[in-house]
Amino acid sequence: MVFNKFVQVGRVVYINYGADKGKLAVIVNIINQNRILIDGEHIVRQVIPIRRVHLTKFQIDNVELNQRTVLLKKKIAKFDLTKKYAETSFAKKQAIKTKRANLGDFDRFRVMVLKKKLARTSAKSK
């Protein structure tokens, strides 16, 4: 299997740490081997360490070096990034994690009861 997720201008990244955690951005410039300049629809243009982002399989074509924010937002909208990203397995797993993290006490109790009921029915069927 060949590695094909390179750090390059136009690559879509998922921010996995910091104030913008969980948001998508696009690499606009590569500063050095550890830092990149990112910009996106819901974040401010900023320098971020590469270790704080997750490279996705998406690459937006025709993104120029230091692309202006307005033009970049148009290209992101044309690419339909949020819809394509929502269909990936990584996005689905992240949605499940956030949903489970936001459960209340009673909701966790209901999940526990349902798991017990499911275990009982599967044990009876054996």
Swiss-Prot record:
Keywords: Ribonucleoprotein, Ribosomal protein
InterPro entries noted in UniProt: KOW, Rib_uL2_dom2, Ribosomal_eL14, Ribosomal_eL14_dom, Translation_prot_SH3-like_sf
Record GO terms (molecular function): RNA binding; structural constituent of ribosome
Gene Ontology annotations of biological process type: ribosomal large subunit biogenesis; translation
One annotated Gene Ontology cellular component of this protein: cytosolic large ribosomal subunit
Gene3D superfamilies from the UniProt entry: 2.30.30.30, 6.10.250.2270
Membership in a protein family: Belongs to the eukaryotic ribosomal protein eL14 family.
Name of the protein: Large ribosomal subunit protein eL14
Organism whose genome encodes this protein: Tetrahymena thermophila (strain SB210)
Taxonomic lineage: Eukaryota, Sar, Alveolata, Ciliophora, Intramacronucleata
Gene expressing this chain: RPL14
